[in-house]
């Protein structure tokens, strides 16, 4: 048995030029990762349309997520979480430009 210990809130990478995706665990169709954003948004006209479910928890910063078919983005603040089922088209409209936005994301695919 091995044990891995870390702290999601420390040693944040520089993310002012691009989002940083850092895998924490990958096992049998499940991936847990830390995402660090700093003012990024999904490019205009692009949508995420994933083959897997994704649950995200906002640990710091703020973000706005637009779900296809909705007229206004959902505002996420520290502690908010969101479940995006497979093929739920969505886009990140905004992340805080003045502070890192830190996400914990869990991805899984049911066969």
Where are these regions (language model features)?
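Short strand-connecting beta-turns/loops that link adjacent beta-strands
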Residues: 29, 70, 97-99
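Ligand-binding loop in jelly-roll beta-barrel domains
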Residues: 77, 86-111
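A short beta-strand-loop-beta hairpin characteristic of the jelly-roll/cupin
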Residues: 48-50, 55-78
